């Protein structure tokens, strides 16, 4: 990837994780004069070792009148809870702040197609599934963005780029599109009520419609996918209005928008959006029988082609929305239905996302560590019965109150982490629960009870919480659960999960 417009130009990079390092690499190869900084001494030391040609000077010493742009890593806050000092500094000199995604969109060839995927839940799986199907169809595809490989590190000659884009990344693109809302108590924990939020959806999306008008044609992707929007990341975006506006930025400049309609907020966005659009649903048919993909608990039907749940490697129920979006995108890219079905059949899914680990006698073990909010856990809970549910961590806004209607599927809840007492209060007189010291304690207690049952049972790690109270990330939490399962199965006969 060549950033020719920045040749001989001074460009600053802040944040030296994977994204920042990829930006430095491309800038240097493109002949730009790169400046870089990070608050972390460790990250600075690593970057200095890798890129001798880069100027590692404190930003306060830059000649900001010479800096063409500041390329910011997505982890750096630009508004909430308060702007990072580098953001304030750049703005004081009217310096343009950009993301690596903007650099990529500026540099890509006109004939290269971009599929951008966002949403609160399901982004990574949908991005990966679309890419997998397109590769199965013989397309030259690159997959990345927020998922794994930074966008500027992707191969430069791909025919189609399938890019996962998080709200943190979208926030950096055309930042004036964010609606400032300074009332930080708008969705304060105990006062939050889902029903009240839904009443505000129409009001929010009226504002959002004006946002999409202003940003139309600015974020140029060929196909955008907006899966769903549920309460999340309010600590970063300041309010639900801001979060909705940021998530919706992707659809404004796309040639076609694929929008989920199982979610109240995105359904309202679909109704108000005036551009080219396709509705998708994982629970009902939105198009006529000849065009739509119908996903049931035991099978998937696409035109005259069928896939039974027993032949799929992923759970069709919990992945229904992801599959519907993938079908829509691949049909738009001229992939035939038979190839789409074969691609879904051969897709193994992603680790820590409703991942079937194996069976020990009557007990199925499922690692859904990526479920960091209630809506994500809901999909896993609806996929199984007689569940021993390991849940808890650092709770998100709204907790697990929205899952109360599904508690009948829970045999017992095993509570871990900071959220234990809050979740215990939610579950009181509704479901049997036990407080556990840690994940290992919960795993042991769950298996001791589950193995005694003559019925088929499921031990499900689906925390509905962030992992940061005990782990560095959801991957570390999930890997710990996987190791516990592997250690346990050594003394039992393994039945292959089908």
Curated annotation (Swiss-Prot):
Compartments where found: Cytoplasm
InterPro entries according to UniProt: Folylpolyglutamate_synth_CS (IPR018109), Mur-like_cat_sf (IPR036565), Mur_ligase_C_dom_sf (IPR036615), Mur_ligase_cen (IPR013221), MurD (IPR005762), NAD(P)-bd_dom_sf (IPR036291)
Pathway info: Cell wall biogenesis; peptidoglycan biosynthesis
Domain of life from the UniProt record: Bacteria
EC number: 6.3.2.9
Protein name, as recorded: UDP-N-acetylmuramoylalanine--D-glutamate ligase
GO BP of this protein: cell division; cell wall organization; peptidoglycan biosynthetic process; regulation of cell shape
Family matches, as SUPFAM superfamilies: MurD-like peptide ligases, catalytic domain, MurD-like peptide ligases, peptide-binding domain, NAD(P)-binding Rossmann-fold domains
Pfam families: Mur_ligase_M, MurD-like_N
Family: Belongs to the MurCDEF family.
Keywords, comma-separated and alphabetical: ATP-binding, Cell cycle, Cell division, Cell shape, Cell wall biogenesis/degradation, Cytoplasm, Ligase, Nucleotide-binding, Peptidoglycan synthesis
MF terms in GO: ATP binding; tetrahydrofolylpolyglutamate synthase activity; UDP-N-acetylmuramoylalanine-D-glutamate ligase activity
Cellular component GO terms held in the UniProt record: cytoplasm
Role this protein plays: Cell wall formation. Catalyzes the addition of glutamate to the nucleotide precursor UDP-N-acetylmuramoyl-L-alanine (UMA).
Catalysed reaction, written as an equation: UDP-N-acetyl-alpha-D-muramoyl-L-alanine + D-glutamate + ATP = UDP-N-acetyl-alpha-D-muramoyl-L-alanyl-D-glutamate + ADP + phosphate + H(+)
Binding site for ATP: 119-125
